[in-house]
C-alpha cells in the first residue's frame, strides 16, 4: 500500500519530490468481487489477512490477523484515485518487482510502468524474493540500487 500512497502524493506534490523508489507497489486490486466489497462488507466484517510472503527461511513480517472489509473497500477507491494521477507523475522512478510475488500480480507493475508519465523510469526484477522483498534475499540489492538512485536524483 506504500507504493500506491507514494504515487498518489507524487501526482499532487511533485515539486517536493526528487524521485520515487517503489518495491512491489500496489495500484489496483484485480477481480470482479472487489467491485462489490462495499456491499459484502455489510455482511462479512473481515477476511483473513495476507502477509509473510518471504522466501528466506526464518524471517517473518508482523501483520494483522484479519483485514476489515470496509477498509478494503476504501483501499479500492483510493487506488482508483491514485491510478488516475499516474500520467501526471513526471518524477524519476525506480521500481522493484518480485517475479514470484504471491500477494500482488505483475499487472500492478505493468500498469505503473505503462501509465506513469515519468520519462525516467526503471524496473528491476527481483528473482530471489517474494512480496516482502526488503526482508528477503534481494534486500541488499534493493538497498544498494536505491542508494545509487537517491544519490543520482538528490541534487
Model-derived features with residue positions:
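Catalytic active-site module of serine/aspartate enzymes centered on a nucleophile-bearing elbow/loop
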Residues: 127-155
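Conserved alpha/beta-hydrolase "acid-adjacent" motif
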Residues: 102-108
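Active-site nucleophile loop of the alpha/beta-hydrolase fold
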Residues: 9, 21-31
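Active-site signature of alpha/beta-hydrolase-fold catalytic machinery across serine-
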Residues: 8-12, 111
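Gly/Ala-rich beta-loop-alpha elbow adjacent to hydrolase catalytic centers
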Residues: 2, 6
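Catalytic histidine neighborhood in serine/cysteine hydrolases
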Residues: 110, 114-132
